Curated annotation (Swiss-Prot):
Similarity comment: Belongs to the ubiquitin-conjugating enzyme family. UFC1 subfamily.
Name recorded for this polypeptide: Ubiquitin-fold modifier-conjugating enzyme 1
UniProt keyword terms in alphabetical order: Isopeptide bond, Ubl conjugation, Ubl conjugation pathway
Function (record text): E2-like enzyme which specifically catalyzes the second step in ufmylation. Accepts the ubiquitin-like modifier UFM1 from the E1 enzyme UBA5 and forms an intermediate with UFM1 via a thioester linkage. Ufmylation is involved in various processes, such as ribosome recycling, response to DNA damage, interferon response or reticulophagy (also called ER-phagy).
UniProt domain comment: In absence of UBA5, the active site is solvated by water molecules thereby reducing its nucleophilic activity. A linker region of UBA5 is required to reduce the amount of water molecules in the vicinity of the active site and elevate its nucleophilic activity.
Source organism phylogeny: Eukaryota, Metazoa, Chordata, Craniata, Vertebrata
Residue stretches spanning the membrane: none
CDD domains noted in UniProt: UBCc_UFC1 (cd11686)
Entry PTM: Ufmylated at Lys-122. Deufmylated by UFSP1.
Cross-link (Glycyl lysine isopeptide (Lys-Gly) (interchain with G-Cter in UFM1)) at residue(s): 122
Length: 167
């Protein structure tokens, strides 16, 4: 994993017990319940640490997720839509998070705005199936990706704050 702060954050996220994906009907309902409980705890912990940085919701089946994430840089809030589908082979296969408006703006992204998590995150996910869930995906996948990519994209002038664009 990463630094001590990251280990602490991840240790406070409840691990999941049910090894089930969307094909597993009744077990999937149990897995979804665990996913929501884990996400709620993670968001509560973030709010308590004054580090609230995303919102997620899903369709009724829990197979399509969407929401917003934001990154604060130089006291300016940069907000992005996020989306992902739960793979049929979940939890063995991690979801691929897309940030559509950043599509094509960084080399660390695949077509369609899917962020690159292969080198660092996917091996970690594979070692922790079925304990890791969507809260872990956000904490160890999207969060670090935003922390590296967004300041770089801002510095290069690839993205600008919405208020600066309207002036």
């Amino acid at each position: 994993m990463a630094d001590e702060a990251t280990r602490r954050v991840v240790s406070e996220i409840p691990v999941l017990k049910t090894n089930a994906g969307p094909r597993d009907r009744e077990l999937w309902v149990q897995r979804l319940k665990e996913e929501y409980q884990s996400l709620i705890r993670y968001v509560e912990n973030n709010k308590n640490a004054d580090n609230d940085w995303f919102r997620l919701e899903s369709n009724k089946e829990g197979t399509r997720w969407f929401g917003k994430c934001w990154y604060i840089h130089d006291l300016l809030k940069y907000e992005f839509d996020i989306e992902f589908d739960i793979p049929i082979t979940y939890p063995t296969t991690a979801p691929e998070i897309a940030v559509p408006e950043l599509d094509g703006k960084t080399a660390k992204m695949y077509r369609g705005g899917k962020i690159c998590l292969t080198d660092h995150f996917k091996p970690l996910w594979a070692r922790n199936v079925p304990k890791f869930g969507l809260a872990h995906l956000m904490a160890l996948g999207l969060g670090p990706w935003l922390a590296v990519e967004i300041p770089d994209l801002i510095q290069k002038g690839v993205i600008q704050h919405k208020e600066k664009c309207s002036q």
